[in-house]
Amino acid sequence: MRPALAVGLVFAGCCSNVIFLELLARKHPGCGNIVTFAQFLFIAVEGFLFEADLGRKPPAIPIRYYAIMVTMFFTVSVVNNYALNLNIAMPLHMIFRSGSLIANMILGIIILKKRYSIFKYTSIALVSVGIFICTFMSAKQVTSQSSLSENDGFQAFVWWLLGIGALTFALLMSARMGLFQETLYKRFGKHSKEALFYNHALPLPGFVFLASDIYDHAVLFNKSELYEIPVIGVTLPIMWFYLLMNIITQYVCIRGVFILTTECASLTVTLVVTLRKFVSLIFSILYFQNPFTLWHWLGTLFVFIGTLMYTEVWNNLGTTKSEPQKDSKKN
């Protein structure tokens, strides 16, 4: 029952989280900092109450290691959300972040001296080609949609290039954080709930440097039209409602992934998360009518197939099917 519940939480929480993030970004593209701050604050408070036991429970992993991880995590979160302010459409944002496999493999080879099979290199090549196709086609759309004048088109393209640079940086930093996390878990054991709390609580002072931007967007949120929440009948500015729902769905999404990692094999977790990204992407295209050409679909297909190949889903499904047959023959 718990694995089924976890899958339900991942799909419901993560997919709806993307919807509310897009609703926020469409109205105020530069609202990434206030969204990141609200998410971090909520998870930090929840973790302080239920995981850290109001600060009485000492951490299993020394704080100095969390400080390194937190610096990377904070940077990745802020840069990823800020990229939406740099002419990056939500579908491209989702596709580009699916390139985490490429970043993990590159850094795994360079830092951990890992070696992979030809099959995995092929899958990574597919993911790379898929991301390149989607990125290239999005670049053409940015210049054509902003062609009020040649100067405007060029300026929009430069901002878009900065957005791609930001996403690439966040992708590599995220992969480096994953490798660092892996070495910590090998040394101190897995403490994912504790890591979740410290990764969100320790960076909170860093938002002081973003306070001006957060305040400006809070003022803009206050000026948005009023919205009455169904059932409870409370009225509040609609942007605050979107932010509240984004925080709640983010928490549901994270809890779902956490339950999934404790109940299922890592292969299942990867497959569920990949399928969730694919569903979110399709919903974003259909519901928000984001521009998506045949080339974008081809690129997305390459990314999806490459990800499934990397996780060796078909091989593992084949093994699991053959095991019951062997058992029945023995009986």
Curated annotation (Swiss-Prot):
- Cellular location of this protein? Endoplasmic reticulum membrane
Motif Mediates endoplasmic reticulum retention positions after renumbering to this chain: 326-331
Q: Which family does it belong to?
A: Belongs to the nucleotide-sugar transporter family. SLC35B subfamily.
Report which reactions are catalysed by this protein. UDP-N-acetyl-alpha-D-glucosamine(in) + UDP-alpha-D-glucuronate(out) = UDP-N-acetyl-alpha-D-glucosamine(out) + UDP-alpha-D-glucuronate(in); UDP-alpha-D-xylose(in) + UDP-alpha-D-glucuronate(out) = UDP-alpha-D-xylose(out) + UDP-alpha-D-glucuronate(in)
Q: Which GO terms describe its molecular function?
A: UDP-N-acetylglucosamine transmembrane transporter activity; UDP-xylose transmembrane transporter activity
Organism lineage reads as: Eukaryota, Metazoa, Chordata, Craniata, Vertebrata
> Chief location of this protein?
endoplasmic reticulum
Q: Mind naming one GO cellular-component term on file for this protein?
A: Golgi membrane
How this chain sits in the membrane, per its record, is: Multi-pass membrane protein
Record flagged with keyword Zinc: no
Q: Which UniProt keywords apply?
A: Endoplasmic reticulum, Membrane, Sugar transport, Transmembrane, Transmembrane helix, Transport
Gene field: SLC35B4
GO biological process: any one? Answer: regulation of gluconeogenesis
Protein name (record): Nucleotide sugar transporter SLC35B4
Task: Please describe what this protein does.
Answer: Antiporter that transports nucleotide sugars across the endoplasmic reticulum (ER) membrane in exchange for another nucleotide sugar. May couple UDP-alpha-D-glucuronate (UDP-GlcA) or UDP-alpha-D-xylose (UDP-Xyl) efflux to UDP-alpha-D-glucuronate (UDP-GlcA) influx into the ER lumen, which in turn stimulates glucuronidation and excretion of endobiotics and xenobiotics.
Keyword Lipid biosynthesis tagged: no
List where the protein spans the membrane: 4-24, 30-50, 59-79, 92-112, 117-137, 153-173, 201-221, 229-249, 251-267, 268-288, 291-311
What Pfam families does the database record attribute to this sequence? UAA
